[in-house]
């Protein structure tokens, strides 16, 4: 068989709650679908279920908006309580014209600091990003190794917008046990010309591929990618974030 990738969606996960064994839930759902893990698989998991398992869910009923949150909410015509949560999850505000773009404590630049109303029960509930997505990925990789005996790489994905293109795409916000970047500098193209600047965001590309099977309403928060060739590595998704001193727009 020629080399290629195969992707397997893992549907049927129940609503995840704080403290649940996410590795067991995923493994059980895979078994129900007749799927088993193999060494070298990459498991892409939606951020939302990781956040729920870690208790990163906030009831807006408990939030008291600050004066700054109320000011921004009036300007943006948003719930001031949700804006307050965004401010608490942010290092700084980058834009507040039509949407609130912030830099999170992780260093991500995204809308609303990743605070999200979707796919969480209740009108006044929001989810937050995991505190340390790379650590979350490593803990999940270790737990699945114990349960399956297989060494599986993990990517935690979330959907981000892009400044100059329409539409959302899935990116890696956490990773474990695989290279997140493919540095091709120093190699040559097919014409023998040296590559001097090419670094591929491999983890983001894998997250985007899995995102085609996840969707927003399909109830498929986990996807197995099989056939991707890589050497195990201890790189973190945090290393994909461009340093501020190299960023022309921040």
Predicted regions and their residues:
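N-terminal and secondary-structure boundary signal
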Residues: 1-250
């Amino acid at each position: 068989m020629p080399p290629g990738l195969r992707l397997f969606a893992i549907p049927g996960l129940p609503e995840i709650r704080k403290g649940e064994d996410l590795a067991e839930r995923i493994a059980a759902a895979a078994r129900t679908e007749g799927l088993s893990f193999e060494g070298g698989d990459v498991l892409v998991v939606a951020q939302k279920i990781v956040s729920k398992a870690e208790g990163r869910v906030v009831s807006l009923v408990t939030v008291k908006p600050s004066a700054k949150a109320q000011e921004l909410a009036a300007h943006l015509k948003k719930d001031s309580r949700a804006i307050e949560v965004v401010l608490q999850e942010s290092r700084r505000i980058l834009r507040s014209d039509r949407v609130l773009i912030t830099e999170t404590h992780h260093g991500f630049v995204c809308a609303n600091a990743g605070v999200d109303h979707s796919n969480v029960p209740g009108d006044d509930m929001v989810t937050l990003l995991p505190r340390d997505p790379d650590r979350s990925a490593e803990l999940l990789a270790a737990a699945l190794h114990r349960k399956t005996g297989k060494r599986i790489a993990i990517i935690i994905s979330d959907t981000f917008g892009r400044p100059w293109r329409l539409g959302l795409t899935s990116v890696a916000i956490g990773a474990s046990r695989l290279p997140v970047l493919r540095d091709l500098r120093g190699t040559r193209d097919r014409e023998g010309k040296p590559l001097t600047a090419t670094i591929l965001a491999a983890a983001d590309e894998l997250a985007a591929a899995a995102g085609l099977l996840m969707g927003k309403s399909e109830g498929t928060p986990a996807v197995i990618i099989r056939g991707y060739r890589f050497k195990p590595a201890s790189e973190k998704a945090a290393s994909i974030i461009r340093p501020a001193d190299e960023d022309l727009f921040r």
